[in-house]
Amino acid sequence: METLRYRFDGQRGARAGLEHALVGVVASGNLEVLVERVPLEGAMEIDILTAARGFGAIWQAVLDDFAARHPLRDVRISINDVGATPAVVSLRLEQALDVLQGADA
């Protein structure tokens, strides 16, 4: 297992909604995403536990894209990954954010 941690400067808070949201499932080719509202001095933190070692540059690219589209303040995202593709990672991140902000996933 490899642990990765990223931190992004936030520009806006997540819309009103739940305090946390959990989407996905930890299974082969998939991942679980937990999003929580926490005081982080205006930052967004993303912690990843993955079975796929050596893909830090790909994770960085996917998360840079997500953070550019959603520069959220005071949000922690925890990802438990079992080899999901970048497209699945992006999908689950969007789903988790939708649930957190009160939309149906």
Curated annotation (Swiss-Prot):
It is found in: Cytoplasm. One of its GO terms (cellular component) is cytoplasm. Transmembrane segments: none annotated. It comes from the Bacteria. GO terms for molecular function: acyl carrier activity. Covalently binds the prosthetic group of malonate decarboxylase. Belongs to the MdcC family. This is Malonate decarboxylase acyl carrier protein. The gene is mdcC.
